């Protein structure tokens, strides 16, 4: 059974970033995700300008940056448009396929161990450590577990149980996302 200082469940931006900084500090980190990277993600393709504070990310962002948003149109209650134009970006458009994979690669380069394509089945917090069982039957131990796999990862589920919070989404809280990529000519993007 392998032991880690920290096990991070979920290798999306939050999990990969946590793994990166922990590994950079010399911690032995397991980064576990049910998906294999690179993988598509249908949400979160916009980064706020605060991403500029992370030098290790923006120094290589040509790998994942698609475009900068310098203009936006917002419509009011009477459908009156308000046009915002700026020389500085409002936000950056990225491809999650490339961005998430880049963050995972940064974490691995700092020494994190990536365990991909296997979901966390359960975990048990003991006096001495955390025992995490993976869906393939493997068991890992760690001093700490971080839940970064979304609102229903195993850590979030445990917190919901402890705090007596609902375990299922209500029908009115559920939405469907459709991801479709359309080729748009440069002449339309620069308007």
Provide a role label for each language-model segment.
Residues 106-191:
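Predominantly flavin-linked oxidoreductase catalytic cores and closely associated redox partners
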Residues 1-14:
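Beta1/beta-strand and adjacent pyrophosphate-binding region of the FAD-binding site
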Residues 20-43:
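Glycine-rich FAD pyrophosphate-binding loop
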